[in-house]
Design a protein with these regions (language model features):
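Phosphopantetheine-dependent thiolation modules in NRPS/PKS and related acyl-activating systems
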Residues: 1-43, 874-880
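Acyl-thioester-processing domains in fatty-acid/polyketide/NRPS systems
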Residues: 102, 114, 123, 241-257, ...
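NAD(P)H/NAD(P)+-dependent Rossmann-fold oxidoreductase cores
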Residues: 63-186, 241-246, 256-474, 529-548, ...
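Phosphopantetheinylated carrier protein domains
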Residues: 1-13, 26, 216, 221-232, ...
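Flexible, glycine-rich beta-alpha linker
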Residues: 193-204, 208-247, 270, 326-332, ...
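Short beta-alpha connecting loops at secondary-structure transitions
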Residues: 2-7, 162, 442-445, 478-484, ...
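Glycine-rich loop motifs involved in handling phospho/adenylate chemistry
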Residues: 2-16, 188, 202-206, 301, ...
Length: 891
């Protein structure tokens, strides 16, 4: 829908006026349910083959990012926001019904602030009038919007009117208020009851309508980046004073994060983690099997992107499709439509002549408006033809998604014919980009309502009818906020929160919400200057081959559910809101000094990446570098010290938590220290809940300036996950290997290996049946400097595992290799305690790599390693160096 700068609120006194405006903008005419079109074969005249075809290979070239709770530092480690809550502050508090707002008013009054408290049920116009009168002498300093602390109750028990009223109280009135007071740029702190994790935990959102308020808040922050904006989420609770204290505290500290959750005194933001699809040929249990009996309901079906996705689903299923859109059913015999299909530009002349024949001036705006109508008709026809070409059946319904009765009639048809919906794809919506100061209430309600009311009407009509999966079109605007899109962001974040809540309310339905970035080659973002704007922002536009196939990949790869960001490079869209962001690095000085040799200083607490530390390492100072040279010349960071760095960083925020395991470690690229010069590396750890544990998504990265490049090249060298638990792992016992038979001496081992004294951890090795065994060398030189710093992941014991496995590979396969993966490493408390007798390791090869166990002389397990895999070096080990190892390890 094209922006109309002359649109005024007074022109839309009723919903009928709004619907009429949409139909006028899109060229749609009302079509009754009796007019639903059923098409069984494509027409010969329509050339509607999709321009792009979905491709799983293109999907897998992009990261699959999932929002998840990300632990934030305590407020004592955060910098002030700059907000003053005291004399001279004029603060509006929109109250909840549970008493939190009332407690907050008392606290603010004690601080000397002037307060205007308004009930959430207050009519919007009355709210605006009260604020206008109150702000005559002095503008607002800030707003506490607490209406979304109230639980709206089960959504299935609401009717359309109560649904709209619930959203009016929460977000429509919020927009109207900020449209009025935007020039004063008041701070905004909202409260919600999504569960304390903004719905990104395994349990799902509790009161999902609050998601609309959070989406609005994120976009307000993007429009006014210098203003404090916080969306504070809580679990269900009857507490009032404690929550009011939290709201005050969050107002005063940590300006670097909008989405804040509070659970058991712990602070959580929302970060992103990459969760890739499984291999195409190895879908996980719970994957959907699309076929000829599959039933699809798709809204927004006349959009070019949705049409292409429909074609992809149809081609790979041949099922039954119910396509819903405001646009009328396309007539393949329409001469103008056929002209558009043949040559869209030539139709402009025809349209101009038709406008002139009506006695109107054929302006470019009128011509483009009419051309857009034919674009939607062509997209609808393309979807219809794709379904029928695949042998499927298509029913096209021209329907306004805001019309509950019309939507119910369509869904009742499906219920009568099939009794179920396998895939409900809600893509209907429109976007009118306009800043808060210019966006009238009618525009906000229109953009918000098509998505929000459309979803409600669909699910209300479906009732308890089985639905296999729902897929809601969201956008990166909903995930990150976007200037000029407070309505679009609010609606999209609402759909994401509802999808999260369905884990509670409809556990048998896989509810998915996709945060799309701008598409390349197809859709509105390809027009005008948008591609150039995206390029300037560093945002990678979505390859259509990937976007078209993405939904099919989500459905058929496993039991995926929840919110997913579908994008390549996010650029400034996901840029931090604060340079620090929000955290005082000096608050971690003592913790860093006690952590170990791999943590230098805290750089920032990133919203997306978690806690980020930097460390400068020098091969001339650190034995673990000087004695670890891959070609006996260039120092390499040992893989085990990469693991150590991940563990040290992960425990900085929660030093009282114990290391339970290190999981899914990938050694992606060697970290080399060229010419023995120092290098600075960064380690990030994004901590999120995982059942009763905490799981840290970790990366080890470094930058290097290459000749001819203006900017440093950043490389991710290692990735992995650190699992933390409230208690230490339980002690384990295992029988140590029996030392007997032929042996490989330390001299023979390190004639083959490149390690120097500090990493010559094998004293002697031997074969123990179908596995290798080795004894740990005693009296090794220091691993690091200063030597009194602790290590947390027993790096040289894990190195013992690596080297024992490597000896088996040399002796059995004649291959020299480097680490590439560890599925799981467990360092038990005994590894840090006094041990009895010699330490030994066994390394046994299985289908998923080597499993290794390090024990002391009494059989206490110190380290367990699972799934250790390697990658062969390009240069083979000379035969004379292999021979003594092969003589012991080979049959």
């Amino acid at each position: 829908v094209e922006r109309d700068e002359n649109l005024q609120l007074r022109d839309f006194p009723t919903l009928t006026h709004v619907i009429g405006w949409v139909r006028d903008k899109t060229g749609a005419t009302p079509v009754t349910m009796a007019g639903a079109a059923t098409v069984s074969a494509p027409t010969a005249a329509s050339s509607t083959a999709p321009k792009f075809v979905g491709d799983f290979a293109a999907v897998d070239e992009l990261p699959r990012r999932v929002p998840l709770p990300a632990m934030r530092p305590s407020l004592t480690a955060c910098v002030p926001t700059g907000v003053e809550l005291g004399a001279g502050s004029r603060i509006l508090v929109v109250l909840d019904e549970g008493g939190v707002g009332a407690a907050l008013v008392k606290k603010l009054a004690k601080r000397g602030a002037e307060i205007l408290a308004v009930e959430a049920a207050t009519a919007t116009d009355e709210l605006l009038a009260q604020v206008a009168k109150w702000s005559t002498e002095q503008p607002l300093t800030g707003v506490y919007w607490l209406a979304s602390l109230d639980d709206e109750g089960p959504l299935g028990e609401l009717d359309l009117d109560s649904w709209r009223e619930a959203l009016r109280r929460r977000v429509v009135a919020l927009h109207a208020l900020f449209h009025q007071v935007i020039d004063a740029e008041p701070f905004l702190v909202t409260g919600s009851r999504l569960g304390g994790f903004h719905g990104h935990d395994a349990d799902g959102a509790t009161a999902p309508l609050g998601g609309a308020v959070v989406g609005f808040a994120k976009s307000y922050k993007r429009e006014r980046p210098d203003v404090l904006v916080k969306a504070v989420d809580f679990p269900a609770s009857r507490k009032t004073t404690a929550l009011a204290d939290v709201l005050v505290d969050e107002t005063l500290a940590d300006p670097g994060c909008v989405e804040i959750g509070r659970v058991d005194d712990q602070r959580w933001g929302v970060g992103l983690a990459e969760v890739p699809f499984p291999p195409v040929d190895s879908p996980e249990p719970g994957a959907m099997d699309l076929g000829t009996d599959s039933v699809f309901l798709i809204t927004g079906a006349a959009g070019s992107i949705v049409s292409a996705i429909t074609a992809d689903l149809a081609t790979h299923s041949g099922g039954t499709f119910h396509l819903l859109d405001l646009a009328p059913a396309p007539d393949p015999a329409d001469a103008d439509l056929q002209q558009y299909l043949a040559d869209p530009n030539s139709l402009k002349t025809t349209i101009a002549e038709q406008i002139a024949a009506r006695g109107e001036k054929p302006t470019p705006v009128l011509i483009e408006k009419e051309l857009a109508r034919f674009e939607r008709l062509a997209s609808a026809l393309s979807a219809i033809d794709a379904v029928t070409s695949a042998g499927g059946t298509v029913h096209y319904h021209s329907v306004d998604l805001r019309d509950g009765e019309a939507v119910t009639a369509v869904v009742d048809q499906i219920r009568e014919a099939h009794g179920r919906i396998d895939v409900l794809l809600h893509a209907g919506g429109l976007e009118i980009s306009k800043g808060l100061a210019k966006k009238e209430r009618a525009e906000f309600e229109l953009v918000f309502g098509v998505k929000a009311d459309g979803w409600f009407n669909l699910m209300k009509a479906a009732g308890d009818m089985p639905i296999g999966a729902t897929v809601a079109f969201s956008s990166v605007a909903g995930r990150f906020g976007n200037p000029g899109q407070t309505d679009y962001a609010a609606a999209n974040n609402l759909l994401c929160s509802i999808a999260s809540g369905m884990r509670r309310t409809r556990p048998d339905t896989r509810a998915i919400a996709l945060d799309w970035t701008a598409w390349a080659g197809i859709g509105m973002a390809t027009r005008g200057s948008i591609p150039k704007i995206m390029e300037a922002l560093g945002v990678q536009m979505l390859p259509p081959e990937a976007g078209i196939a993405w939904i099919r990949r989500e459905l058929t790869s496993g039991p995926n559910r929840g919110e997913v960001v579908v994008a390549g490079r996010l650029g400034k869209m996901a840029e931090e809101l604060d340079a620090a962001p929000g955290v005082d690095p000096e608050a971690f000085t003592e913790a860093c000094a006690q952590a170990g040799p791999m943590v230098g200083r805290v750089v920032r607490a990133s919203v997306n990446d978690g806690l980020v530390v930097s460390t400068t390492l020098d091969p001339k100072e650190q034995p673990f570098l000087n004695d670890h040279r891959g070609d006996r010349v260039t120092a390499l960071l040992p893989a085990v010290m990469g693991i150590e760095g991940m563990v040290e960083t992960a425990r900085l925020l929660v030093p009282d938590w114990a290391l339970a395991a290190v999981e899914d470690v990938d050694f992606l690229a060697p970290l080399k220290f060229y010419r023995d010069e120092p290098r600075t590396l960064t380690i990030s750890a994004l901590l999120h809940p995982d059942g009763e544990d905490l799981l840290a998504e970790c990366r080890v990265e470094a930058e290097r300036e290459l000749p001819g490049s203006d900017t440093p090249t950043r490389t991710t060298h290692f990735t992995g996950r650190v699992r933390l638990a409230r208690t230490q792992p339980a002690a384990q016992q295992a029988d140590p290997p029996v030392r007997e038979g032929a042996e490989v001496t330390s001299d023979d081992v390190y004639a083959a290996y490149f390690h120097g004294p500090a990493y010559q951890v094998v004293d002697v090795a031997w074969r123990d049946g179908d596995r290798s065994a080795a004894q740990f060398a005693s009296d090794l030189p220091d691993n690091h400097a200063p030597s009194d710093q602790p290590t947390q992941a027993a790096p040289r014991l894990i190195e013992l595992c690596f080297q024992a496995a490597g000896l088996w590979e040399i002796g059995r396969d004649g291959r020299m290799a480097l680490p590439t993966h560890v599925t799981r490493a467990v360092v038990l408390p005994a590894a840090h305690e006094a041990v009895e007798g010699p330490l030994t390791v066994t390394a046994q090869r299985g289908s998923d790599g080597f499993d290794c166990t390090v024990t002391d002389g009494a059989g206490s397990v110190l380290v367990r390693l699972e799934g250790y895999r390697t990658i062969e070096l390009p240069q083979p080990l000379p035969d004379d160096l292999q021979a003594p190892i092969r003589a012991v390890m080979a049959d």
